[in-house]
Design a protein with these regions (language model features):
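Long, charged/polar, soluble alpha-helical segments
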Residues: 1-132
Length: 132
């Protein structure tokens, strides 16, 4: 009976250690996934803004507006993630980028080439947010 109790205790300890060992890698993996998602959102937003600038250069204001609208969602996700991580300066820069995108979209709706300047400012704000 004593040997059975020892075996059960050792089995419980082994299962507990196995669980702890498996869970320890999960935190690092989850952080890696979140970092990759952040980079993906930033790259997606940048690509839409750059596409919008090309459309503005080609005087295709309708496509530019669509591209700028598509840039808002990843910018918002990136900003929210930065805020939740406590990166205040980066979140503020990302919020500024979002404001520039909205201004660019508004100008594009008026067929104003100044939208290109606002889109450029949005890219600078994104660069500022990601360089910190």
């Amino acid at each position: 009976m004593k040997q059975l109790l020892i075996v059960v205790v050792l089995l419980v300890v082994a299962v507990g250690l196995g669980f702890a060992w498996g869970a320890s890698g999960r935190v690092a993996l989850q952080q890696g996934v979140e970092d990759a998602q952040q980079q993906l959102d930033v790259l997606e937003a940048r690509s839409h803004i750059l596409d919008a600038r090309v459309s503005l250069y080609n005087v295709n204001f309708g496509d530019a507006q669509r591209q700028l609208e598509d840039a808002k969602a990843p910018l918002t996700r990136a900003r929210d993630r930065m805020q939740s991580e406590g990166k205040k300066n980066a979140a503020e820069a990302m919020a500024a980028a979002l404001t520039h995108v909205q201004d660019a979209q508004r100008l594009a709706s008026r067929l104003d080439q100044g939208a290109n300047t606002q889109a450029g400012e949005a890219l600078k704000s994104i660069q500022s947010a990601t360089s910190k």
